[in-house]
Amino acid sequence: MTILVLGINHKTASVALREKVAFSPEKRDLAFQQIAQSELAQSEVILSTCNRTEIYLHNKHISPEADQENQRWLEQCIQWFADVHQLDVDELRNCLYIKQNQSAVNHLMRVSCGLDSLVLGEPQILGQVKQAYQYSEDYCQAQHMPMSSEFSRLFQKTFSVAKRVRTETNIGNSAVSVAYAACSLARQIFEGLKDLNILLVGAGETIELVARHLLRHGVKKLMISNRTLARAELLVEKLEHNKYIQVLSLQQLQDGLNQADIVISSTGSPIVLITAEMVKQAQQKRRNAPMLIVDIAVPRDVDERVEKLDGVYHYTVDDLHSIIQRNLSEREKASKEAETIIDAEASDFFEWMKVHQFSNLIRTYRESAEQIRQDLLEKAVQAIGQNEDPETVLQELSYKLMNKLIHSPTQAMQAMMKQGSIQGLRSFSSALGIADKKERNPQK
């Protein structure tokens, strides 16, 4: 049996190619159908995000060794990957990474722990892996084709490893994105965010990320001010927290400042939007209560003179970048600890899989022998019931039982003799307990 990963990501492929190999739900279902029909694998999980597309396959019938059968199967998988997206196979191959067995297990765990992400240690990827696995599980159940126990165990093990890495290392403790750093800064300055008034200026991607972080931390009073009201309203719809969010025009920006404990601004404006005079007026109405202003726009949205006002804490994007750089260094240290955990866990899983593979073989062998015994015993009981001589029946039973049990091993030894496989014969003979007498009883 073998586990295979075929993938491209932000390190190996352009955005244009990543877009071409993305899997919509419809294309994912088509892929599952094609994989089953062509017998490329018995179980599969497809992970498709903006930064990566990875196909995890489990084939019980392909040897993990690098033999010709394995190579042919690998080429079939690559060709299918290209065909399903109508791509030239060479174009895909140039950007493709291929990992098998323990390397594949290790890769899945690294991906799920955020060690292979664009932002080191980011937690979102684990949720995306879980969704990909659940999608595959649901599809298998709908088709009455259960996912293989080995593959299911691999993903469950991966999820527990990711949890362990989060618990035992500091991989996710430090902010490494501008949006997250802004929110972390707010949580450091104010004990809690839930009862604060927060004003966001802008409605782009960064402000969306900031809003999501804030809402996740229980913020109940959020204002969004933007030059285009329609875009701000669209953002509110995407956030799905309408009752907590108020939309303001830029003409109402002063009203928002008058209420705000925290201001985070990120627009594309070529001019300053929040002047020192506007903040001074707001502070007079707020009686100089602490106000945090985080300007993450380039060019700047906020007049830098606001930092001289009483009660105002002013940070720019450069301040955040220095925080992020320090935090990245911390994550780099934590990632080394995470790698040690992953290497050990991946090795443990692969050892289990190898033993599990052969335990199935042993169980099948025992079941086969038991079936032979039951069949012959049933015939012997019937013969004795028909008044045949018990001694003759038992003699025949023992003779037939011996012949049936040694039939397959005898054929295997004959095949090895024809091939001249001396080492194979020695190993097989030793396993059967019939090593050459001279070897067992050497002359003194």
Swiss-Prot record:
Residues that hold NADP(+) according to the record = G202, A203, G204, E205, T206, I207
What EC identifiers does the entry list?
1.2.1.70
Query: What PROSITE patterns does its record include?
Result: GLUTR
Q: Which GO terms describe its molecular function?
A: glutamyl-tRNA reductase activity; NADP binding
* An individual GO BP term: protoporphyrinogen IX biosynthetic process from glutamate
Pathway(s): Porphyrin-containing compound metabolism; protoporphyrin-IX biosynthesis; 5-aminolevulinate from L-glutamyl-tRNA(Glu): step 1/2
- Catalytic activities: (S)-4-amino-5-oxopentanoate + tRNA(Glu) + NADP(+) = L-glutamyl-tRNA(Glu) + NADPH + H(+)
Which residues are annotated as site, described as Important for activity?
Answer: H107
Q: Does the keyword GTP-binding apply?
A: no
Q: Which cysteines are joined by disulfide bonds?
A: none
Q: Where is the active site?
A: C50 (nucleophile)
Task: Enumerate the HAMAP family for this protein.
Answer: Glu_tRNA_reductase (MF_00087)
Q: What else is known?
A: During catalysis, the active site Cys acts as a nucleophile attacking the alpha-carbonyl group of tRNA-bound glutamate with the formation of a thioester intermediate between enzyme and glutamate, and the concomitant release of tRNA(Glu). The thioester intermediate is finally reduced by direct hydride transfer from NADPH, to form the product GSA.
The subunit field of the Swiss-Prot or TrEMBL record says:
Homodimer.
* Domain topic, free-text comment: Possesses an unusual extended V-shaped dimeric structure with each monomer consisting of three distinct domains arranged along a curved 'spinal' alpha-helix. The N-terminal catalytic domain specifically recognizes the glutamate moiety of the substrate. The second domain is the NADPH-binding domain, and the third C-terminal domain is responsible for dimerization.
Which family does the similarity line name?
Belongs to the glutamyl-tRNA reductase family.
Name recorded for this polypeptide: Glutamyl-tRNA reductase
Q: What organism does this protein naturally occur in? A: Mannheimia succiniciproducens (strain KCTC 0769BP / MBEL55E)
Source organism lineage?
Answer: Bacteria, Pseudomonadati, Pseudomonadota, Gammaproteobacteria, Pasteurellales
